[in-house]
Amino acid sequence: MLGPWHTHVDADDWEPMELAGETVGEVHSLRSDDGEQPYEAGLWRVLGDLPAPFAYEFGQNETIHVLEGSVVIDVDGGPVLELGEGDIASFAAGSRAVWRISRTPFKELFVLS
């Protein structure tokens, strides 16, 4: 089916986001891989205490829009990005970075393609 896709976010509509066996915030999916196209879009949030910095490899091209809070993303072989509310960034598949959430609550819109 070709869209449109729609979702409504309630307080209970979030699932834990796991990286390397550690919970790093929560995610709410708008659209996931349908088997034909590797595509995903949704929201990611971190509430409460600041998590420890974590390594992340971009498995797909990924674009983010920071909606709340701030993050420092240290891209291997690239710049250190300091992103806050309203900032948008895009990363190529295969890129690696260390993420450090610097202000909570943190929330971003993400699109993987």
Question: Where are the regions a protein language model picked out?
Answer:
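A short, N-terminal "cap"/entry segment at the start of jelly-roll beta-barrel domains
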Residues: 1-40
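Ligand-binding loop in jelly-roll beta-barrel domains
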Residues: 93-113
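Short, conserved beta-strand element in jelly-roll/cupin
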Residues: 58-73
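Conserved short histidine dyad/triad with adjacent acidic residue
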Residues: 40-58, 92-93
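Short acidic-glycine-tyrosine-enriched beta hairpin
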Residues: 77-93
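Short hydrophobic/aromatic-rich beta-strand segments that constitute the beta-sheet cores
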Residues: 53, 73, 108-110
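Active-site helix/loop of acyl-thioester processing domains in fatty-acid/polyketide metabolism
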Residues: 48-50, 71-74
